[in-house]
């Protein structure tokens, strides 16, 4: 029986790192849904799209594919250009739009269908995979999350200040929690883990215990 693991939480809570390492530890597939929203944010911002009608038309021209650990946008390989604070804000802006969420939710459900997988995002346990076998909700203080994101961006060679990263975190928290469509919130049956003072290894260890209890992998 497939074991689908949903990992949700706000920007910078450690979702991506935890999800990748967890998938590696379990030997199963990993899906970064946040990257998909960033790709759509990049594409729609490049095309100056605003109305729902324009968004729906542009989404019909959009093809997101995933191969060998890389995302492709209409055949164009996507790299660190989607990891900037600016694109993060665009991603959160367009994530509020129903056509975008419907478009990506359909793709995400199709990818996760009938296989063991770690899916990471903001509405996985509540909207995308409400029947996931394991649901985890990660949280951390805004300053801790900003420090992590800043370090990550510096290592990737992205030029940004800590203040810019912290401002993005604060803004995205507000946008993600207040949007009408699929707002960021903990699923009732999700396990809450505060990662502020935990190492990545400690977080992984806690999640693996839950997976062992609920899945046969």
Swiss-Prot record:
- Protein family according to the UniProt entry: Belongs to the cytidylate kinase family. Type 1 subfamily.
Q: List the molecular function annotations (GO) for this entry.
A: ATP binding; CMP kinase activity; dCMP kinase activity
Q: What is this protein called?
A: Cytidylate kinase
Cited InterPro entries = Cytidylate_kin, Cytidylate_kinase_dom, P-loop_NTPase
Encoding gene, per UniProt annotation: cmk
| Source species taxonomy | Bacteria, Thermotogati, Thermotogota, Thermotogae, Thermotogales
Annotated localization: Cytoplasm
Q: Which positions carry the signal peptide feature in this UniProt record?
A: none
Task: Look up the domain of life of the source.
Answer: Bacteria
Cite the EC number: 2.7.4.25
Q: Which UniProt keywords apply?
A: ATP-binding, Cytoplasm, Kinase, Nucleotide-binding, Transferase
GO cellular component terms listed in the entry, alphabetical order: cytoplasm
Where is it mainly found?
A: cytoplasm
What is an annotated GO biological process for this record, any one?
pyrimidine nucleotide metabolic process
Query: Which reaction is this enzyme known to catalyze?
Result: CMP + ATP = CDP + ADP; dCMP + ATP = dCDP + ADP
Asked if the Swiss-Prot or TrEMBL record annotates the protein with the keyword Electron transport, the reply is no
Q: Cite the binding residues for ATP.
A: 9-17
> Species name for this entry?
Thermosipho melanesiensis (strain DSM 12029 / CIP 104789 / BI429)
